[in-house]
């Protein structure tokens, strides 16, 4: 069998893109889980049928997919969390398996991938309880995902943010539904029970929020000795904020070296394991190191509009306040910056650079955080843009395959942009109101 056109790094990133499709819909938890499972059936083999959409047996990946992505089987999930009955997916994860992955500079190995979903722009829970919950920290040395609370920073032990601790707890608490792959099991139970063939790898991957959760989950399960059935555990996080502080980053780096023993170093910037890859024009991975947060307001140039510039400076200032409040010094795990390029349009709409409005800023942010990693197809007079990891997005499913589970509604890109703007303004306003209340108390 010929190797797919995507290398191993790109295939793994492709899995992170697939699980992220959960953000494109609204519905109940059950409806969203079925929709994600249906979407996966175009790309993966052995996805259990979604009978409500007329499927009658396990899937076979579409013929347009395997020459690009390779032949992967769904073996667990997908599982999905909807925390507040808010009609959106807050966390999602699945596990896929391939009999033979050719690792550049390394061997050909059977491989499992744990793919974790990115931040859902429409999820207030994601923003408040996971992404932005960094002013308090949790001691990693005593962390128990089923029961934890923030603690004072002692400067000696490794610590993770409260948001990261919450996300890991959520992922480990998920149980697959009866119509999913490996029904009625948790992720930890599944990984502990797998009996892989000799010389099998497992890779944890995820983008954005999952760029913080995937290395943290891999480290937790490794320390709990849940990965012993596998000969090699790797991580491929992208666009993630910092999950923890200096001691945590050092612990991760020493546990997961960037180059497995005996493997050859690769030449392209995205080609390294156990390394967080990030676009240097992406706002999200500038969190939560203070020196990087100090760049976000003017990352796309200082706005000529007073109110826009004031809003972005407030966003930056409040982010720094939150990141430094606990006393922990947030620090990236080993990482590789990728060189982004500013974009001047989104579809047929122009984007002002520097941004004249919050809309300009968020549209640029969205492109840099999402589309620049996976490539942008040509659109009218706009030429295609080669992605930083994928040259172009994975093959799209044809309209004949795009069925929708009853009760599900789709979320447009414009709606995502509007929601991000709303979340940012709401977050700034919440901090400003807190400052006003503190000022009133001090006057009294």
Give residue ranges: language-model regions.
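N-terminal low-complexity, Ser/Thr- and acidic-residue-enriched intrinsically disordered segments
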Residues: 1-109, 115-119
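A conserved cap/lid and substrate-binding interface adjacent to the catalytic center
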Residues: 71, 75-202, 225-228, 232, ...
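Short, solvent-exposed loop/turn segments at secondary-structure junctions
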Residues: 119-121, 211, 242
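Short, polar loop/linker segments at the starts of domains and inter-domain junctions
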Residues: 32, 129, 294-296
